[in-house]
A protein has these predicted regions:
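A structural boundary/capping signal
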Residues: 1-123
């Protein structure tokens, strides 16, 4: 299986298995990053997708947790993946991997290989 197909499968699997629920509703706090069990918000989806891809042997330097802002101004977190078909975003709002340039987000920062970095001109 090529890397794009694996990313597509994991994205679909996680999006279907987790029901969106804010950290405030679930934990009583605005932010709580963890692996989801049935419920989670955007960073929980991204963390689970990252975990499942790593378990399949995906290189850590080809994955990044991205913090961004949606057009509404609300903070959001997605997973960046580098595949055999290029770079894509795995997002709980999309059923399929999306090119960063096709998303309406303002990119803030990315955690890749253990280092947070500012994103300038990412898309």
């Amino acid at each position: 299986m090529n890397s794009y197909s694996l990313a597509e499968r994991i994205n679909s699997q996680v999006n279907a298995s987790v029901t969106y629920k804010t950290d405030l509703a679930q934990y009583g706090t605005p932010e709580h990053w963890c692996l989801p069990y049935k419920f989670g918000d955007c960073e929980d989806y991204a963390l689970l997708k990252r975990k499942l891809l790593l378990e399949q042997g995906w290189p850590t330097d080809k994955l990044g947790l991205c913090v961004c802002y949606m057009p509404s101004g609300e903070g959001h977190c997605v997973l960046w993946v580098d595949t055999d078909k290029g770079s894509f975003i795995l997002d709980n709002n999309y059923a399929f991997p999306v090119k960063p340039s096709e998303l309406p987000y303002k990119w803030e920062s990315m955690l890749c290989d253990g280092v947070w970095q500012q994103l300038h001109g990412f898309a």
